[in-house]
Amino acid sequence: ADALGIAAASLTKDSMCANCHGTKAKRDGVVSVISGVSCESCHGPAQDWLKPHGEYFEGMAFKTLDQLRTDREKETDEHRAARLKAVSKAGLIRPKQIHTLARNCLDCHLIDNEKLVAAGHKTASAFELVSWTGGEVRHNFFMNKDDNAAAPSLWMKVENRTAAQRDRIKLAVGTLTQIEMALDRRAKATSPAYIPQIGGVVAAANGKLAQIS
């Protein structure tokens, strides 16, 4: 921030740093940081989807998590399909949208701001989709509040698929997405400080893909 002349007072407002290190909201026409990295950082701004994404039938009223689990059992296939389509349209990045989720992660973990990198910021985190979404960020408590499941409940309970299947998909899609975005950034790069670093990201991701295949 100092190297780019970003004032300390702006760090909790509408600064580029807060794009990744915080969650912004507009209140009374003023943009400010309301929290650190949050649900919305991964799943997208929640204003339009937060309520409907947990409504399993018309007229449903949220009471407790136990009641929510019971209510989800009553949801019809038709309602579920319509609900998931609607919340995706409203901006929710769902766990099943692995490519979109990976791109959203890499928007912060693979820097495209060449001035920021030239000022000393790292081009990339040691990001890997499987491990980074399976660590402290994992939050699959819907079916059991005491058991952080290895994969989302819809994936395992409704689609009858396993956590291992999901991890294999995440490994391949995450690596391909890293190559996709790094190549795009390399094609647009002009900074002598940025070009070799983003080129290194491409090479590393390509090597990982070769190991996978």
Per-segment meaning from a language model:
Residues 1-4, 26-37, 41, 45-213:
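Primarily the internal scaffold of c-type cytochrome electron-transfer domains
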Residues 2-30:
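Mid-chain, structured segments of secreted extracytoplasmic proteins
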